[in-house]
Structure formats: C-alpha cells, structure tokens
Amino acid sequence: MHALPYKGDRMSGLLINNSLVHYETFGRGQPILFIHGWLGSWRYWVPVMDLFSIDHRTYSLDLWGFGDSDKSRERYDVDSYVELIISFMDELGIWRAPLVGHTLGAAISTRLAARYPDRVSKVMAVCLPLNADYINRKLLTAGSNDALARLFWQRQHPYPEVESSLPKMAHNAVALTIQAVARLDLREVLEEIEVPLLTVYGGKDPVVDPSQADELEGNHYSARAIVLPDAQHFPMLDEPARFSRLLRDFMDVETAEQLQELSVKKEWRRRTR
C-alpha cells in the first residue's frame, strides 16, 4: 500500500491507497497503538493516551468509515482493517508495538497478532466477542447508526467523547463492522497468538457478553481474562483508574507466568519523572 503524509487544518493524517486516515499521537518513548471500536472514534482513547504519554509514544487512528477518516468505501471488514493498521505502522516507522483494541479494534488486534506475529509485542483486547453468540442479538439486526447507538446507551449514560463522533460515522459503518466481526470465530484466532494476550470485559456490558471470560480461562487459551465488575461497554471510560492501572501492569508482562498473575488493583497513580 502506498501512503503519503497529509496535513489538514488541525489534524494529522496519511493517504493510504488514496484514502485519508486521520490519527493523533501524544508523548515520547516506546509506542502503544490504540484502536477504537464500533461506536465513536480515536477520541475516547484520549484520557488513557494522555496518562501513558509520560513515558510512551501513544497513537490512535480513526478507522475507515469513522471520525475524520475516509468514508467512501462500500465494505468495512476486519481483514481490510488489519492491512490498514500494518500500512499505518509502516508509514510511521512502527515496527513492533503493543496493541490495545476495543470490540472491533479488539478483533482487528487479535487477527493482526495471529497474522503478523513479528509486528505485535502484546495485545489487550477489550470487550472482545469470541463469536456472534456473545454479541447482543439486537445489534445484529438494527440497521441505522442511530438505532445502534440507542442500543449501546440503553443501560448507561452516553459519553461526550463517543457522542461527538456519531455524526461523523459513515451511514453503514457500524452495522457492517458488527456483521463483519459476527462472521468470525475468534477462538480459532486466539489459538494462533503467541504474544501475551489480555482480554478485559465490563461486568455490566449490555453489548458484549462478559461471561465469555469464563470460556477463555477454562479452555486454557494463552490469554488472561479479567472482568471489571462495575464497568459497562466502555471500561476505559467507566473505570478509568482501574483500567489504566491494569494496562500499566500489562505493559510490564513478559512471561506466561506474569500474565496469569495479573489482577485488578484498586488505585492507579500517575508516575512522575
């Protein structure tokens, strides 16, 4: 894929296959790449990116069909997004990095780690649906973005970071990406992943069933599954301190033994230089 730098009035971007990819980056240090999910854009990662920017170079992009990235595509599928992320990393000189993905972003991250193991050092997959059985069935049949958004907010207050991005989504992006993930059986993908894999679920998530954490742990995948009991579909916004502490601890994980020892800490304090 050929990419060229792009500078809009107030944003950074790349042209990949003649399609704009908007991204933002904070901080200096080792890279971490954050990938958003079905609803919203890069913006809801800002609080976590800011916390980690003290000692990492944090990146997040708008996937095609979302935010300020290109919306001219007729199809939005996981494998195309995998190639998009690889091209994005290539153009920014990121050879290998941890991936932190949410729902759609979690599916992309796990698929990418299985296909390109040399490019990923570890994966945090947040609210990862293993297959269609773990996705709220109403999401699979709701058509418009507005109808889907109402399902997301049935049991929790909308977040401004997410709500502000809704008008910018392609009219069919949410439905098509939900269907794309639902067609996959990610249990097969997880068996191919060799790097540390942490899955995180919200215990009160109305969108992705958190009970699959038991299946992940019970079937001895090379993964650790942790449930944040009071979180819903956006754990990074519902419980930001616990989520950030968990991610910080995960960044230090190098072995399977360390991965299994991970647990949720009650407090997280920002490190100082």
Segments (PLM) and residue ranges:
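Active-site loop/oxyanion-hole signature of alpha/beta-hydrolase fold enzymes
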Residues: Y59-V100, R245
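Conserved alpha/beta-hydrolase "nucleophile elbow" surrounding the catalytic nucleophile
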Residues: H36-W38, A97, G101-A106
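Conserved alpha/beta-hydrolase "acid-adjacent" motif
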Residues: P206-Q212
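Short beta-strand/loop motif that positions the catalytic acidic residue
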Residues: I193, T199-Y201, D205
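Flexible "cap/lid" loop of the alpha/beta hydrolase fold
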Residues: A107-R115, R119-L151
